[in-house]
C-alpha cells in the first residue's frame, strides 16, 4: 500500500462499483498514520461508495506507540511515561505522550469516514470501544477453513473424554510475554494433571500433556 499511494489512488478511484479497502496491521517503523488518513479522505471524496474496514490485531490503536500493553494501563491516562521502551515497536526516546492526542484524532477521523473497525479479540475491542464509543469495534472471531487445513486431517482420533477442563493457548510465539504472560504459565503449571492443555504456536514454556 505505502510504496506508491498515487498509483493506489488511481486504481481505487477508477474501479467501477462499490469497493472495500481492508486494513490489517499498519503499524511499523515507517508508517505515517496521518498520510494514511489523508489518503482515505481523498479517496472517499472522489469515490463515496468505498468502504474502509480495519481489523485490529493488537492494542496499537489505543496506545501512544505500543502494540501490546503487557499489563500496562498507561494508555488510559495519556501514556505519561512508557515503562517498556523495548516493547514492539521499540524506540530509543519516549514520545508516546506527545503522539497520543494526534494519533487518537486520526482514528476519530477514520470513524468519521465510516471506517468499520473489527477485531478477533474481545479485550482489544473493549479497549477500543472504551475510548471511541460503544460498538465502534465489533468482534469477528478468527475461523479455520477445514477444507484447506490438511493438518486437521492428520490429527489422531480423539481419545475418550478425560473429564478434565480443556484449556487452549493460541499465539504465533508463545514465549513472548505480550502473548503469554509468565503469571499464566505459573498458574497452568500449578494445576498439573487437573487440566488438559492444548497449545497452538511455537516455543511454549511448558512441556508434556
Stretch-by-stretch model annotation:
Residues 1-7, 22-29, 88-95:
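A short, charged, and often flexible helix/loop element on the N-terminal side
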Residues 10-31, 48-57:
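Short N-terminal targeting/anchoring amphipathic segment
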Residues 19, 136, 161-168, 196:
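Charged active-site motifs of nucleotide-sugar-dependent glycosyltransferases
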Residues 53, 57, 111-122, 138:
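A short beta-strand/loop micro-motif in the catalytic core of glycosyltransferases
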Residues 75-117:
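Membrane-proximal helix-turn-helix segments that form the acceptor-binding/catalytic region
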Residues 123, 143:
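Carbohydrate-associated surface elements
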Residues 157-179, 185-188:
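Conserved donor-binding/catalytic core segment of Leloir-type glycosyltransferases
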Residues 165-167, 182-208:
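A conserved nucleotide-sugar
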